[in-house]
Amino acid sequence: DARARSFVARAAAEYDLPLVGNKAPDFAAEAVFDQEFINVKLSDYIGKKYVILFFYPLDFTFVCPTEITAFSDRHEEFEKINTEILGVSVDSVFSHLAWVQTERKSGGLGDLKYPLVSDVTKSISKSFGVLIPDQGIALRGLFIIDKEGVIQHSTINNLGIGRSVDETLRTLQALQYVKKPDEVCPAGWKPGEKSMKPDPKGSKEYFAAI
């Protein structure tokens, strides 16, 4: 979409975008979870859990349910490594609830294992730099936020491109692994594979072993 591409090109100049390595913008909003309305505040997770925060354009669309249900189906894997998932769109909680109450075979979500946050004011999408102003919807932004509330990873896809749960999980596992002192993860690293020390000797040892 040309308008989305134009937005991305000028976004850095128009917004104070959250950067990897900086604190995530806090927010408080209504959400739907377990077919109930709840309140969610991002800072409530500080000191407790990692957060996968992902934005999607709209409820009752086409690519969006494939992503949302894929994350729900793999929720237990994220839960095991102390991580919560939050989905966000500019829809109301009433729209979220109706979508959750619609069966998957009819284009709905069915029961989800994590909250869907309502960003009707568009303030959350704007604060994370994913809002397309002239369309009033969010690009497919995904942010991994650590237990200190710091953004450790971000990706933004255009509207027609879904995201990979496998790659999100792999990246999260790598981020948690490198919390160990003096360890870094090479390309495509997965748990159980060899990492390296971030110095000339360590890199030589790594390359000699592969």
Swiss-Prot record:
Q: Does the keyword section mention Oxidoreductase? A: yes
Respond yes or no to whether keyword Transit peptide is given for this record: yes
Active-site residues from the entry: C64 (cysteine sulfenic acid (-soh) intermediate)
Q: Where in the cell is it found?
A: Plastid, Chloroplast
Give the first-level EC class, as a single word.
oxidoreductase
Catalysis: reaction(s): a hydroperoxide + [thioredoxin]-dithiol = an alcohol + [thioredoxin]-disulfide + H2O
Q: Where is the signal peptide?
A: none
Thioredoxin domain: from which residue to which, for each copy?
18-177
Give the record's keywords alphabetically: Antioxidant, Chloroplast, Disulfide bond, Oxidoreductase, Peroxidase, Plastid, Redox-active center, Transit peptide
Gene Ontology CC terms, in alphabetical order: chloroplast
GO MF: thioredoxin peroxidase activity
Q: According to its UniProt record, what is one Pfam family this protein matches?
A: AhpC-TSA
Tissue expression profile of the protein: Expressed in leaf blade, sheath, basiplast, stem and green spike. Maximal expression in young developing shoots segments where cell division and elongation take place. Not expressed in roots.
Q: What is its main location?
A: plastid
Cross-referenced InterPro entries:
AhpC/TSA, Peroxiredoxin, Peroxiredoxin_AhpC-typ, Peroxiredoxin_C, Thioredoxin-like_sf, Thioredoxin_domain
> Which portion of the chain is the transit peptide?
1-10
What Enzyme Commission number(s) does the record list for this chain? 1.11.1.24
Give the superkingdom in one word: Eukaryota
Binding partners and assembly = Homodimer; disulfide-linked, upon oxidation.
Say what the protein does. Answer: Thiol-specific peroxidase that catalyzes the reduction of hydrogen peroxide and organic hydroperoxides to water and alcohols, respectively. Plays a role in cell protection against oxidative stress by detoxifying peroxides. May be an antioxidant enzyme particularly in the developing shoot and photosynthesizing leaf.
Give the family from UniProt: Belongs to the peroxiredoxin family. AhpC/Prx1 subfamily.
Annotated PANTHER family:
THIOREDOXIN PEROXIDASE, THIOREDOXIN-DEPENDENT PEROXIREDOXIN
**Other remarks on this protein:** The active site is a conserved redox-active cysteine residue, the peroxidatic cysteine (C(P)), which makes the nucleophilic attack on the peroxide substrate. The peroxide oxidizes the C(P)-SH to cysteine sulfenic acid (C(P)-SOH), which then reacts with another cysteine residue, the resolving cysteine (C(R)), to form a disulfide bridge. The disulfide is subsequently reduced by an appropriate electron donor to complete the catalytic cycle. In this typical 2-Cys peroxiredoxin, C(R) is provided by the other dimeric subunit to form an intersubunit disulfide.
Return the protein name. 2-Cys peroxiredoxin BAS1, chloroplastic
What organism does this protein naturally occur in?
Hordeum vulgare
Question: What gene name is given for the protein in this entry?
Answer: BAS1
